Amino acid sequence: MALTYMNMALAFTVSLLGLLMYRSHLMSSLLCLEGMMLSLFVTMSLTILNSNLVLASMIPIILLVFAACEAALGLSLLVMVSNTYGVDYVQNLNLLQC
């Protein structure tokens, strides 16, 4: 079981590094965020299943709800930016520009 946790920690770390290194395009940032949320979901689900906590069994579902809201908001931002500027660069999201 420790190998599974190590793989999920590695997946989270790779997604975090991808988010930090490749942040020029909005789509790649959204994919890295989804990878982070997926690894957190699997880790939390495995932890709750192994510890037999009945009251905490709703926490992964709540995390999935937040991940779905984050994905919907991110995709709507992607559509807005690509319709306005024609590209999906993160630098176009600067609100201080006129």
UniProtKB/Swiss-Prot annotation:
It holds the Pfam family Oxidored_q2. InterPro entries: NADH_UbQ_OxRdtase_chain4L/K, NUOK/Mnh_C1-like. Keywords: Electron transport, Membrane, Mitochondrion, Mitochondrion inner membrane, NAD, Respiratory chain, Translocase, Transmembrane, Transmembrane helix, Transport, Ubiquinone. It is found in: Mitochondrion inner membrane. One of its GO terms (molecular function) is NADH dehydrogenase (ubiquinone) activity. The keyword NAD applies. It is a multi-pass membrane protein. It is an enzyme of class 7 (translocase). GO terms for biological process: ATP synthesis coupled electron transport. Core subunit of respiratory chain NADH dehydrogenase (Complex I) which is composed of 45 different subunits. This is NADH-ubiquinone oxidoreductase chain 4L. The lineage of its organism: Eukaryota, Metazoa, Chordata, Craniata, Vertebrata.
